[in-house]
Each structure stands twice: as C-alpha cells, then as structure tokens.
C-alpha cells in the first residue's frame, strides 16, 4: 500500500496539455506585383504543444487576410523539421517547395517573406533553408539556398500610412464642416 496522497505527490504545473498561448505575429506576404513583401499583423491563439516557429509557418501557409496581398507558400509545401539554435532557424521543407517555385512572386520575395517572418517573431538573426535535408539546392532556377539568409528590410514595401491618415482626416472634416441640404 502506498498510503494517503498529499499535496507534495502532485506536480503543480500551470501549463497543461490542452493549454493555449496568445501571440501577435508579424507576417510578410507578397505584394500583388510579386516584387516586394508587405507586413501583415495577425493575432493567434495556439496550443502550448506547438512551437512558435511552426505557428508562424502555418500562418504563412494559410495566406494573407488582406486581399491586396498574395500568399508565398502553397498547400503542397510541408515543414519536415524546424529548429532554432544559436540565433539561427533551420527550416527543412519537402520537395514541393522547389516544385512550386514558379509562382507569381519572385524567388527572393518568397524566401524573404519567410525569413523576415521568422526573424521578426522568433528573434533569430538568420534562416537556413533545407529541402529534404539538403541545403545545396536552387530555388526558382536562380536563388541558391546554400547559405543562411539574414533579414532583409530593402524588400519590404512601405505602405503610405500618412496618405491614408490624411485622406481620412479630410473626409471627416467634410462630413463635420459642411451642412448638407435636403436631408
């Protein structure tokens, strides 16, 4: 016989098997022209059993919410493994990643949408790509994946937020300042 169980017989772990976490993600998708990436913010709840790097990649695969943006990953692309070690994220994808490289976005756009999304959310400095465990591959017939990729700010399309704010202020002043006749 074991005897009566006391409080010290149990593990006090506030994070359980079916617990969820919340994250505000910075994701990058292709512009419709396919030559730049555009930032999209997304709030997600995800299982504590799933790593943040997998959540970021799943959200990239789900595509953008904004209809003025285009996705960078197809449904056929699978993440075989993803690891973070010493400020480097190593991402191993299946062969479909190379097979679907002939999309509308430039190869650099697809790669840096993934790199910038992973760097911004995970705090890593670089991303090393692998396809079926091999880094010595070429993406889109022109981009070697042999070396690690660092975050690239030059490829980000800066949206003119100031113009949107100015237009909103002008429309609001017209609504408030001009009495409309015939209502």
Where are these regions (language model features)?
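Bimodal "functional hotspot" detector
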Residues: 1-183
């Amino acid at each position: 016989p074991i005897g009566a169980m006391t409080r010290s017989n149990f593990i006090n772990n506030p994070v359980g098997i079916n617990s969820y976490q919340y994250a505000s993600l910075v994701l990058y998708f292709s512009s419709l022209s396919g030559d730049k990436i555009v930032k999209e913010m997304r709030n997600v709840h995800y299982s504590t059993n799933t790593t943040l790097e997998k959540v970021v990649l799943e959200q990239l695969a789900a595509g953008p919410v904004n209809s003025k943006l285009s996705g960078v990953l197809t449904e056929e692309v699978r993440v075989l493994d993803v690891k973070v070690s010493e400020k480097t994220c190593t991402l191993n994808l299946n062969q479909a990643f190379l097979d679907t490289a002939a999309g509308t976005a430039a190869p650099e756009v697809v790669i840096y949408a993934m790199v910038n999304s992973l760097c911004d959310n995970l705090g890593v400095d670089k991303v090393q790509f692998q396809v079926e465990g091999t880094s010595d591959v070429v993406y889109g017939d022109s981009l070697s994946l042999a070396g690690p990729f660092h975050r690239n700010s030059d490829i980000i399309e800066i949206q003119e937020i100031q113009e949107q704010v100015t237009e909103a202020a002008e429309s609001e002043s017209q609504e408030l300042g001009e009495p409309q006749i015939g209502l």
